[in-house]
């Protein structure tokens, strides 16, 4: 099967002879809002101007929709949000996930600055940082990554998107993130910065870029960030290093870019996540003050990632373009790890036994895409075909471990109790890995966007065929499976400022390898999650509104770790179940509303987002191998976020800003016996820009969690596992940047 897929790049290339013969030489007349079609030549592909004066740079319209190509977010038949470099720089979040989760109500982060375990939730489903793509290449961000220095834009595609972006080697549901790297601007980039963050962290940054050549064809840009010191949480410190180098060439028909990215973050006391709260027979104890650490400072973790990639665009014909790339990421997450676990009462927790752990990820990613356009009578066609391959090797080594753990009582001074824990783990490592797997994913995608009635009606048909290979190198077991994921999208554009859209898409996750009684090794077909979505966008001139509704269904599956006394054991003995087999369903239904504006002569920029989410499970296997019905854990029912920026009339160059985020209550168990309480966070800030001769000085500051709210940042794991991290306390920061 994979030998056939390996020939797909040749098939893609051969498609051009037909496309060239069928092309019409005339350049079609373009209207501003009707740029949704994937245009193949350089001028049209790059013509991604903003279609609304409400766009202030934070929510740019130009997005990369994978196999569909570069399009306009306003007219896209799926829900996508794009945060550009300006937005990330203004928030000055210490991690990428903290930055992109600031405004959109259907997206919230786990980890980030509060914990070294890092990722996002889309509509109630988890996406780990290692599943982010960079420049369209999957898996290039790195495990538990937090770096932002290389990010020119971060694009959030909501909903099942396997057909659009391909399947991550480890599977993902309900969303994807693509990062576009920074490139040198025409006018050059010359910026240095200094920053301070509470409790006592210093930061230095640089951004240097220049273009060369008669038409500025060649560009080089280097970025760096160093941050070191103590966070506002006691016993939690970080040493952060981020560097990025981009070199690009943009010719008349060919554009090529090379990126090299390095990031390393060392933390002490930064992994205090409370686990398996669903097992408690009482409500979890109240969140302590944000400055309180639930883990000792000697528990240290490191994340390190190195990425090198090459990408290109070639305008092969007037009406057809080839794009592609190849990248390699080498990432590690290592240190001494413990897993604090709530006790049965919910009023105390077990500190866990810290253990030396080294997780290593090596990912090779490549793709080749062809896209173009032609017409058949009154119908326009924007076609695309893409081949993707991802290889990931994942290895985990473990070493010495604490001999015992302790029960910690939060009603008594926590630091005093943590100080009594034995920090002498030893230094011995087991030379045999505890996990050693290789996952390979080959896929071929095709799509055609048909335009009717002067492109007022648009129908996208297509899908992606994917073949997954998985090998366990410890026991030699290997298996493969494949599936075709269809894609159906539609958009109605009755007028240039109104778009009504809908879609059906799927997400895939690899199944477990199973050995039958006769010794035959197999892998079940990939697990399929299905999404239906409808939405409407309206451009009112100085503000834009989006309203959409969605449903996502994801199959459950048996953990299969028990032999008696459970629903799984009974069904296995009856021949009705095995470890990893599908059982039951979890369903998320929701409504989202988002709006952003640019008012008062572009001096007032408010944003608002609201999501209502219902997450339920039916006949769903839990972590204990029993079937449950009820709500899915740790998913807030209501999330609302509002923000504003105001360019003050009384002080030229002064901008004031603020954000309010509300997270409704969620539940720590499927039976709704015990709830995580709701909470509201408030941030305020200011930015002042002034001229120093020919240079520009920008001074920014902010207070995050202004009212020092104590709260649990909830998370969910596999099955019905519910986790929580103590939210960060009030945090101050100040930075100055000089453009010269």
How would you name each of these model-derived features?
Residues 32-187, 534:
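Acidic, small-polar-rich N-terminal luminal/periplasmic segments of exported/outer-membrane proteins
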Residues 189-272, 298-315:
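Transmembrane beta-barrel wall of Gram-negative outer-membrane proteins
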Residues 311-315, 321-327, 331-337, 526-599, ...:
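Membrane-embedded beta-barrel scaffold of Gram-negative outer-membrane proteins
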């Amino acid at each position: 099967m994979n030998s056939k897929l390996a020939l797909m790049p040749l098939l893609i290339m051969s498609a051009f002879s037909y496309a060239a013969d069928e092309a019409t030489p005339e350049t079609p007349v373009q209207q501003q809002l009707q740029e949704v079609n994937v245009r193949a030549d350089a001028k049209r592909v790059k013509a991604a101007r903003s279609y609304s004066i409400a766009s202030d740079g934070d929510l740019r319209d130009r997005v990369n929709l994978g196999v569909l190509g570069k399009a306009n977010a306003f007219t896209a038949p799926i829900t996508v949000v794009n945060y550009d470099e300006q937005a990330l720089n203004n928030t000055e979040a210490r991690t990428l996930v903290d930055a992109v989760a600031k405004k959109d109500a259907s997206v919230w982060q786990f980890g980030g600055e509060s914990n070294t375990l890092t990722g996002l939730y889309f509509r109630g489903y988890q996406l780990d940082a290692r599943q982010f793509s960079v420049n369209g290449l999957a898996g290039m961000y790195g495990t538990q990554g937090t770096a932002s220095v290389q990010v020119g834009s971060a694009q959030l595609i909501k909903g099942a998107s396997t057909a659009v972006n391909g399947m991550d080697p480890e599977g993902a549901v309900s969303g994807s993130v693509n990062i576009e790297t920074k490139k040198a601007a025409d006018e050059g980039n010359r910026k240095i910065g200094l920053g301070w963050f509470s409790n006592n962290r210093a930061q230095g940054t640089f951004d240097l870029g220049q273009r060369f050549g008669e038409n500025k064809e060649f560009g080089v840009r280097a970025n760096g960030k160093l941050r070191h010191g103590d966070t506002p949480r006691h016993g939690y410190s970080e040493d952060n290093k981020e560097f990025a180098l981009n070199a690009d060439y943009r010719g008349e028909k060919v554009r090529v870019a090379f990126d090299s990215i390095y990031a390393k973050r060392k933390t002490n006391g930064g992994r205090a996540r409370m686990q398996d709260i669903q097992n408690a027979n009482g409500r979890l104890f109240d969140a302590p003050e944000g400055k309180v650490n639930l883990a000792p400072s000697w528990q240290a973790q490191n994340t390190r990632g190195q990425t090198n990639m090459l990408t290109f665009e070639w305008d092969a014909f007037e009406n057809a373009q080839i794009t592609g790339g190849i990248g390699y990421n080498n990432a590690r997450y290592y240190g001494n790890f413990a897993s604090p676990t709530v006790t049965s009462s919910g009023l105390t927790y077990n500190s866990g036994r810290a253990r030396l752990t080294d997780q290593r990820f090596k990912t090779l990613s490549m793709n080749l895409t062809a896209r173009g356009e032609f017409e058949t009578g009154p119908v326009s066609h924007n076609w695309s075909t893409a081949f993707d391959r991802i290889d990931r090797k994942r290895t985990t080594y473990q070493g010495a471990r604490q001999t015992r753990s302790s029960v910690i009582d939060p009603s008594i001074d926590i630091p005093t109790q943590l100080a009594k824990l034995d920090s002498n783990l030893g230094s011995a490592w087991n030379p045999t890995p505890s996990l050693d797997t290789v996952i390979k994913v080959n896929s071929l995608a095709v799509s055609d966007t048909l335009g009717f009635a002067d492109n007022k009606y648009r129908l996208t048909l297509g899908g992606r065929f994917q073949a997954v290979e998985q090998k366990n190198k410890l026991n030699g077991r290997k298996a493969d499976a494949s599936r075709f994921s269809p894609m159906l999208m539609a958009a109605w554009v009755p007028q240039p400022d109104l778009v009504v859209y809908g879609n059906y898409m799927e997400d895939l996750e690899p199944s477990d390898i199973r050995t039958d009684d006769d010794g035959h090794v197999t892998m079940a077909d990939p697990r399929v999650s299905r999404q239906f979505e409808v939405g409407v966008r309206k451009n009112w001139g100085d503000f834009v509104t989006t309203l959409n509704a969605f449903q996502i269904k994801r199959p459950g599956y048996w953990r299969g770790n028990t032999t008696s006394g459970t629903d799984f054991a009974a069904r296995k003995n009856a021949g009705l179940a095995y470890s990893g087999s599908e059982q039951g369903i979890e369903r998320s239904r929701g409504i989202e509303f988002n709006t952003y504006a640019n008012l008062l002569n572009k001096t007032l920029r408010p944003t608002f987002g609201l999501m209502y989410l219902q997450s339920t499970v039916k006949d769903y296997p839990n972590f204990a191998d029993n079937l449950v019905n009820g709500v899915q854990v740790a998913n807030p029912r209501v999330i609302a976020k509002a923000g504003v920026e105001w360019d003050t009339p009384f002080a030229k160059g002064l901008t004031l800003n603020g954000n309010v985020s509300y997270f409704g209550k969620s539940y720590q168990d499927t039976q709704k016996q015990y709830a995580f309480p709701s909470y509201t966070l408030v941030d305020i800030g200011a930015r002042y820009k002034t001229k120093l001769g020919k240079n520009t000085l920008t001074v920014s500051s902010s207070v995050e969690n202004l009212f020092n709210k104590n709260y649990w940042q909830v998370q969910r794991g596999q099955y019905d596992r519910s986790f929580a991290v103590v939210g960060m306390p009030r945090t101050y920061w100040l930075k100055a940047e000089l453009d010269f």
